[in-house]
């Protein structure tokens, strides 16, 4: 058994026990308990007790014990449940993806008239290049003056003329003569304006 040491409240000396006044008035009698055939005298103790079991009732200890056990079990069971939940969530995600893949052909069956429409490509309507048969990018057009076509000739005849060669030169149809001086070219651009009328009163 564990040894009990009593400390008096007033002087703090061990081994000295003083009965309180309230206990004397009530006529408290030491109670005798029989345990294992032995008689033990239990007297009311005053002061602090060291190395003694707590004075809580057994029901309270059991309740606290069951609460502690329940929390420990819940903590232990929470770990595997989280792992199971993650496995279930991954399974659900894979099932959803499989269902989504299987549902894609069903959408084509529900709308078969979409395939009957003409395909629309906006780049086809924004292409301003000439066809390959009428490309003029290969012609050396640097330094060429303004060209005026005869009314009898058509555009296709001009486009079918190949690049200029020194042996076969097509007839040049220029607006001005290449041998003219710049002053003569400027004189052709002069336009006669009507005479200024100064007689009008403003």
Curated annotation (Swiss-Prot):
UniProt motif TEK-box 1: location: 71-73
UniProt motif (D-box) ranges: 61-64
GO biological process, one term: chromosome organization
Motif placement: SH3-binding: 163-173
Record PTM Phosphoserine, positions in chain: 165
Record-level GO cellular component terms: cytoplasm; nucleus
Stored Pfam families: Securin
Keywords attached to this entry: Cell cycle, Cell division, Chromosome partition, Cytoplasm, DNA damage, DNA repair, Mitosis, Nucleus, Phosphoprotein, Proto-oncogene, Repeat, SH3-binding, Ubl conjugation
Family according to the record: Belongs to the securin family.
Subunit structure of this chain's protein: Interacts with RPS10 and DNAJA1. Interacts with the caspase-like ESPL1, and prevents its protease activity probably by covering its active site. Interacts with TP53 and blocks its activity probably by blocking its binding to DNA. Interacts with the Ku 70 kDa subunit of ds-DNA kinase. Interacts with PTTG1IP.
Name of this chain's protein: Securin
Originating species: Bos taurus
């Amino acid at each position: 058994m564990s040894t009990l040491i009593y400390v008096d409240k007033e002087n703090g000396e061990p081994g000295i026990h003083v009965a309180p006044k309230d206990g004397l008035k009530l006529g408290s009698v030491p109670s005798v308990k029989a345990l294992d055939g032995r008689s033990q005298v239990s007297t009311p103790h005053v002061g602090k007790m060291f190395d003694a079991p707590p004075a809580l009732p057994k029901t309270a200890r059991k309740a606290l014990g069951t609460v502690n056990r329940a929390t420990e079990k819940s903590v232990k069971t929470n770990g595997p449940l989280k792992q199971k939940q993650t496995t279930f969530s991954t399974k659900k995600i894979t099932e959803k993806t499989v269902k989504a893949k299987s549902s894609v052909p069903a959408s084509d069956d529900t709308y078969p008239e979409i395939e009957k429409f003409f395909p629309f490509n906006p780049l086809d309507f924004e292409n301003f290049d000439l066809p390959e048969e009428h490309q003029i990018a290969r012609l050396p057009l640097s330094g060429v003056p303004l060209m005026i076509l005869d009314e009898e000739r058509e555009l296709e005849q001009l486009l079918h003329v190949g690049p200029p060669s020194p042996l076969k030169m097509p007839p040049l149809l220029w607006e001005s003569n290449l041998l003219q001086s710049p002053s003569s070219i400027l004189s052709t651009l002069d336009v006669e304006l009507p005479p200024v009328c100064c007689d009008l009163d403003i």
